[in-house]
Amino acid sequence: VYPSSRSSAAFRRDIVEHHHARKKDAPSGTAKLLAKVVMKGCPRKTEWTLQGPGDLKEHQLSVSSIRAGHTYSSHILGVDAPAETLELHHASRSPMAYADGALRVSAWIHGRKGVFTMDQFSEETLDPLFKEVKP
């Protein structure tokens, strides 16, 4: 039997994003996309909100936006429980990260015919990085 802190309801899920002070939209498109993905994987979360964690209803996912300083882009997906925290954090230092990604996709698509999705690109280029390596 797991302690109550191990039950799914005891884990709080949230998204925190931080961008430079000049960024106008809040939350960013990336934060909205992350919220959509989290809600798909956690059906009891049916909407995201900018309300703080203290004001959340059970069906809401907290999204926090910070616009300050010179941080180009930072997104944290957090899962928090009374005795532990898990965070997945992505930060980009400049727009070069996105330019590099666009160039990689361009090289991948060069010479192909048809319409492609980022899922197809990821399946061919990123998924192999996570395959089990046998000793």
Predicted regions and their residues:
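C-terminal substrate-binding/catalytic lobe of Rossmann-fold NAD(P)-dependent oxidoreductases
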Residues: 9-135
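Rossmann-fold NAD(P)-binding glycine/threonine-rich loop
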Residues: 1-7
